[in-house]
Amino acid sequence: MFTSEEYGERWAKYIECKHVAVDYNRNVFPVSGTMIRANPYRYWEWMHPIVRAHYVKRVVLLGTDSTGKTTLARALAKHYKTVNVPEYGRIFYEGFSEIPDAPEKWVPEDLVHIARIQSETEDWMRRKSGPVMICDTDAFATQLWNWRYYKEFNPEIERLIKPADLYIICGTDIPFEQDGMRLDDQSTRKGHQLKTYDELERRGWPYMALHGNLENRIAKATEHIERLFLADPGIPKTA
């Protein structure tokens, strides 16, 4: 057994193996398990990616069509030098539209598939993330789209939902841009936004709303994120 702990000898004796002391004075590796548990963000680079994943704070962007989610997600990920989990639904749609004679409308199973892959992608990218992980969307957002299309929540999608540490609702006060897959119906868009607020309130999950241009949104989002998650001086501000 290799340890840097004083109790290593007793532990090795208990399980009947040889103990090899390594770097008792922490000259080579200036960190310990006790130090990491006390402030994991201060010693982020010393943790294995699997361990880091446990401590990652997940920030998810929400909003109806053309509210600047993707642009803001990329900007926040760049600001914090962390990962941006992309929107799998868009990838799925673009591939789906290339299939000859593909159905014109999605079916509920498509949204379950999208939510599942989105969640799996998040789990994988947590290991690549910094202390804060930015998500363009998540399974909860997919559930809101399921409600928009079918006026009900899908229990299969519900089982995939993992509440985020913070949800950011992007406002509709920016010019609408049609990219071929968005629905330019003001009543539907407004209903989607209102349902987003209602559900976050009902579930008691933390959220903030953003309005204004991109620069204002970045400033307000980073201020809120840093106040919530990065206020401890031990957490590196990588911007």
Where are the predicted features?
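Glycine-rich phosphate-binding loop used to anchor ATP phosphates in small-molecule kinases
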Residues: V112-K162
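Conserved substrate/cofactor phosphate-moiety recognition/catalytic segment
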Residues: R74, K78-D123, A221
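Classical nucleotidyltransferase
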Residues: M1-K57, L62
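The conserved Walker
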Residues: D65
